[in-house]
Design a protein with these regions (language model features):
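Structural signature of extracellular appendage/secretion-system components
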Residues: 1-238
Length: 238
């Protein structure tokens, strides 16, 4: 029993380590994206100024901006809109404007609203920030988010389901036997309850509890429970 428990805990520890590494990489990538966006905005400003004076932008400025765009595209998918004045606008995610002319916005790494120890990426606005992790794709950032979403999370949930299933089957078999005193066998493993995580920013006072009726009904999915106008909805987190 101790050997099995240690093995499962070892797998969980490896997944946690991978999660932490992705957190650090996302923080670093967000900083790099912001630096590139700032460079593009500055080059836009110089291109606009030079074009207004000479009628065309110098090739070296255009080449420098193209290099910055290539660096940005290596990290995240973008869409580009070229302006008549020589500037370009850069959009990410679901159309969030990362660069508008000579203004650059910011991509920030912030705690996940359900799991504060996990980093998500948000687009900073004048009124706060908007989580855009689910809409970002491509490049190194898209790869990190995909690794978390498609590899780490399913593996962790599958590991949990495996652990619960093994524990329940073992406990059931153990209960069918008797101990040295002739008493019915008890549970061999203690199985934890279902974890419910409150979202950051909740303004209600409702509390939720989930009861597990058997491992056969478990899935590898996470679910979001929301309340609106007195009605509750449950949907898959992905």
């Amino acid at each position: 029993a101790q050997g099995l428990t240690a093995r499962l805990q070892s797998y969980e520890s490896r997944l946690n380590t991978m999660d932490s590494q992705i957190n650090e990489q996302l923080r670093a990538e967000a900083g790099t994206v912001n630096s590139i966006a700032s460079n593009i905005a500055k080059l836009n400003q110089e291109i606009i100024r030079t074009s207004s004076q000479t009628g065309s932008a110098p090739a070296d400025l255009l080449d420098a901006r193209d290099q910055q765009l290539a660096l940005l595209s290596a990290r995240i998918d973008t869409s580009i809109v070229r302006q008549d004045n020589g500037a370009i606008n850069v959009f990410i995610g679901n159309g969030q404007p990362l660069v508008l002319g000579n203004d650059a916005a910011q991509l920030v790494a912030q705690p996940d609203r359900f799991q504060p120890d996990r980093v998500t990426l948000a687009f900073r606005t004048s009124s706060g920030s908007v989580d855009v992790s689910s809409s970002l794709s491509g490049g190194s950032i898209g790869g990190l988010l995909d690794a978390r979403r498609e590899l780490i999370d399913p593996a962790r949930n599958e590991l949990g389901r495996l652990a619960v299933g093994l524990a329940e089957v073992t406990n059931l078999q153990h209960a069918r036997g008797v101990d040295l005193h002739g008493d019915p066998g008890g549970d061999f493993f203690a199985v934890g309850g279902v974890e419910v995580l409150a979202a950051r920013g909740n303004d209600g006072n409702a509390t939720l509890a989930v009861t597990r009726t058997g491992s056969g009904a478990l899935t590898t999915q996470d679910y979001i429970v929301q309340q609106s106008n007195g009605s509750w909805t449950v949907r898959r987190a992905d």
